[in-house]
């Protein structure tokens, strides 16, 4: 039976009593939660008729008291859930109400569907956690403690927040889309058309790299192999453009494993189940997690050079084509030899040969792939060895004589006019005789000369004040390629014991050439100190550079002081220095490219 409460005062008294019992229960230590922030007034949505069914069947309409102010919670209308469970409590509670400490803590509540944060019923001064209702539609059934309240103007605040989030989300999505669409070529910095050969690149660089790896790519830089490659100057130097393609990571097999065709940025990509899920990259497109190598792996990745893919026959052909032209000396048969005239002829010829040597070195396969520092370093260490092996090679057909030029053929007796020259002449003649006995071939000679160039500065003296080679690993790989080419030449006659011995003997000759070079440096430096003949700019700079690489000064003076005095008065400021020749590529009638 339902009994209606006739007076407003009695209903309010019952409500106050309920609230008092409720607060006593919540004052227990286990219910005390630290206050995080103050809580404003709360209201119940007015569209729901709040009715509570009492155990005796009485009901009280709280809408009648909506105009009255509540003493504790302000304006309020409480919506207590269905009272079917209340009948089980009997009449132990006040006025037929069951005590709140005897009610099941998991009563069911009907919550309004829109998303909002709702506080639990709490005593004044106590802040309780919030929970979020975010069901898409309809009423949701949640288990909770006391009934949920709604904050005033919550709908307006939520709507404003949604609008702000939507506007910021639109801006963020536009920026993200712009970042995803704008990519630049890693080679020339033009707009990238896609992911080609392992990097983002434009159509021009993609097509250039494709032509280079499929066809003939023996490009030569006319300058220093450090040309600027950008959108406007990418066609100015093919050698530097291809070098930059390799530097940024382009490779023949560098294709995206998750490619599906079409615009790649518009497709979702998935990996195999055994490899896990994709990770989102910084631009928003999804990539395999292990597709990009780490910076450490990139740093230690082997440098890729086209020379490593050449066959032995291609290597030999390139070395033969790179040979410098034959130079003539300024010898005048009407003038007798003396120390000054002979040294003048030899130093003038050596200075001109150095210019052609620079162009020859730039055409040696793999040499231009090195940094400019390493190229200059190797030439400074090997220039006299290269001149000497060329001299003994030309002199093989002239026993007992040295063919410096087609019009300058000298024997041992003529070398006596220069102090200290006979010893060097004897070593050169002995080496030429040894090569003649071994019947050295032209292909073998060009391989040996290239090995001298690449092997000269690999083992730098620890006491040297100059910076060591930057790309030793790459130099060793190219050096191995040269050695393999020499072995290939030997194998043409059969891999017999005699051929193995011949290979060892040829390589041993290189140590004798190194010894002759050191002797020649000492003699040339003594001639310079005695002012027998003025040295030319490039030759003088190469002489000083070689002494900088030496471990100690044979004269007993500190090496560092000697070097500083030399550099203060020699080719470091000369307009015809090594760097000048290397940059301009000056050579008399000698082409820079194959």
From Swiss-Prot:
Keywords for this protein: Activator, Cell membrane, Cytoplasm, DNA-binding, Glycoprotein, Golgi apparatus, Lipid-binding, Lipoprotein, Membrane, Metal-binding, Methylation, Nucleus, Palmitate, Phosphoprotein, Receptor, Steroid-binding, Transcription, Transcription regulation, Ubl conjugation, Zinc, Zinc-finger
Residues annotated with Phosphotyrosine modification: 536
Record-listed Phosphoserine modification sites: 104, 106, 118, 167
Region Required for interaction with NCOA1, annotated ranges: 35-47
Any one GO molecular-function label of the UniProt entry: nuclear estrogen receptor activity
Post-translational modification, as annotated: Ubiquitinated; regulated by LATS1 via DCAF1 it leads to ESR1 proteasomal degradation. Deubiquitinated by OTUB1. Ubiquitinated by STUB1/CHIP; in the CA1 hippocampal region following loss of endogenous circulating estradiol (17-beta-estradiol/E2). Ubiquitinated by UBR5, leading to its degradation: UBR5 specifically recognizes and binds ligand-bound ESR1 when it is not associated with coactivators (NCOAs). In presence of NCOAs, the UBR5-degron is not accessible, preventing its ubiquitination and degradation.
DNA-binding region coordinates: 185-250
Residues with lipidation of kind S-palmitoyl cysteine: 447
Recorded family membership: Belongs to the nuclear hormone receptor family. NR3 subfamily.
Region of interest (Self-association), ranges: 264-594
DNA-binding found in the keyword field: yes
Subunit-level organization: Binds DNA as a homodimer. Can form a heterodimer with ESR2. Interacts with coactivator NCOA5. Interacts with PELP1, the interaction is enhanced by 17-beta-estradiol; the interaction increases ESR1 transcriptional activity. Interacts with NCOA7; the interaction is ligand-inducible. Interacts with AKAP13, CUEDC2, HEXIM1, KDM5A, MAP1S, SMARD1, and UBE1C. Interacts with MUC1; the interaction is stimulated by 7 beta-estradiol (E2) and enhances ESR1-mediated transcription. Interacts with DNTTIP2, and UIMC1. Interacts with KMT2D/MLL2. Interacts with ATAD2; the interaction is enhanced by estradiol.
Protein name per Swiss-Prot or TrEMBL: Estrogen receptor
PROSITE patterns: NR_LBD, NUCLEAR_REC_DBD_1, NUCLEAR_REC_DBD_2
